[in-house]
């Protein structure tokens, strides 16, 4: 589970928040799956919308919560959790009724989560190539914090890849070659899912959980 230490968090106000809070963006794939998951489990939460199109994720306020500048972020009674798949696992453990990650399917679901996580860059490439309004491509992207992101007191290597994406996006955007490669990779995985759905109502069987 990726739970941030208090010393990793610069926006200290969230440490005193009570209840469950979710920082999210309407059209973020990772935000959408988290909202769907919470909806299926009937989890009440306070939402905080971060507009990625306006680069609000690069604001000092949000980078003070998660230097990775990514949504979603879950705050539970002042504890900050990042990475959507880890958030799903955390919530399923915290609210065990109507488990969506049942023990008898946990290994298979974990493997699917790893595969899905590996597709994040492809999803981002396609999103920024085809869905981000063209006029925003001409807007100067607010600079990411100069300070290195830390995770559990150590430099966050995951943030290096995130920075590299934004640096390349500022310079050349998403090229046709990159977008095509990402689309083909996504199609490959979606075809595999469609094949499973020809035999079952859901990916892992005829029951949701």
Regions found by a protein language model. Give the residues of each.
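GST-like domain detector, emphasizing the conserved glutathione-binding G-site
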Residues: 1-157, 163
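GST-like fold's C-terminal all-alpha helical module
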Residues: 121-209
